[in-house]
Amino acid sequence: MNLNPLVAMSKTKYLLGVAVMLLGISPAYAERWTLTSKSEVGFEIKSMGVQLVGGQFKQVQSVMHFDPTAPQQGSTQFVLNVDSLQLSKPSLRHMILGEDLFHAQKYKTVSFKSTRFTALGPDQYRIAGNLTLRGVTRPVIFHTSLKPNTGNPKLLDVQSFTQIQRSDFGMKKAMGGVGEKVNIQLKGQWRVQ
């Protein structure tokens, strides 16, 4: 097969151009981060301003692609193992993991996948995405602080929170004095990979 060198060169330039365009619109330059083992992902439920119960997920899979110079290209996702939940009031474990709330026997994980990072100011971001809980997916917004760690350039200090209504995710409403609003929090550090 005898190819015209000009045609071959044009195809090469075209493919190179497509590759450059794809790299330009993907988070290719963003670094990959994972949560450190000391980070905490959990929730608290209050009633009349008093904390009724708090919980922390001990098994968390996480990844974030993030470049502070181009935060709009950032993305993050995490998966929480429901059975790894540790409660501030262990006596409520059966109720919290039961059918009326987490229904852990059927729904093994809670997950979040971002759809948009928005910079609000120095180290402040709004991370929109989809939270899946009990097989129900709803949009949520995490209000987030991501600050370079002063002692280690490979770490970002993070504090992030959102609030949901339990009944939006199929959890039984107004149960035994348990509040309808749930605060979900993440605090700790992201480590660059």
Q: Each predicted region: which residue ranges?
A:
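Low-complexity, acidic/polar, glycine-enriched regions of mature
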Residues: 29-193
